[in-house]
Amino acid sequence: MDIEQLKVGPMDNFSYLLWDEASNEAAVIDPAWESEKIETAISEKGLKLKMALLTHAHPDHVNALQYFETKSPGLPVYLHEADLFLLERKPENLKKAQDGAVIETGHLKIKTIHTPGHTSGSVCYLAETAVFTGDTLFVGECGRVDLPGSSAEALYESLRALAELPPETVIYPGHSYNGNTSTIGVQKDYNLYLQLASKSKAGFLKAVR
């Protein structure tokens, strides 16, 4: 497995390429803002784009999706159904990103973890020792809960679930706010929100509201 992290757009977003090195079959995660930059990375590495994985449906994470659907007609697009209302248009080949489902491309097995909170349909994607957390968990931060479909209570439960991943699991967040990557173990030591979620629901809810 290999990963390319691409910083895109004016909001310090990350889009990702995730691929199986044996077959070069790849997924693009949260394609946004700079479609040509992402396409160049795909071409330079000789990758075969097989799917798009969306952590959630806010525009700053999906606004380059149509470009890749046009380039690859019939491209499977994975999104949790609870976030469909956020999309301006429905993908042509929409697949449900269901909690616990395993998505495969080449030899890659990518597990879907439903992590509502920032949006009702937010998910994280776990591949080997990497977890793509979208706007659920950042380095030193967590997602906002003051937007349509968001819930502080749901985010509390989602962060508690992520904290159960092995400490060596590498976090690949949806934005570069305090750093590009970290691990679950480091964040349990230094991320106030992850700490509060592990200790005090009332304290967590007070901190995020």
Q: Can you describe what each PLM-predicted range is?
A:
Residues 17, 101-126:
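Core dinuclear metal-dependent hydrolase active-site scaffold
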Residues 31, 62, 155, 159:
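Aromatic/hydrophobic pocket-lining residues that form the small-molecule binding cavity
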Residues 12, 23-26, 33-111, 189-192, ...:
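Active-site HxH/HxHxD metal-binding segment of metal-dependent hydrolases
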Residues 6, 97, 184:
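Hydrophobic residues at beta-strand termini and immediately following loops
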Residues 114, 119-208:
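Metallo-beta-lactamase
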Residues 1-45, 124-134:
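Conserved beta-strand hairpin/beta-sheet module of binuclear metal-dependent hydrolase folds
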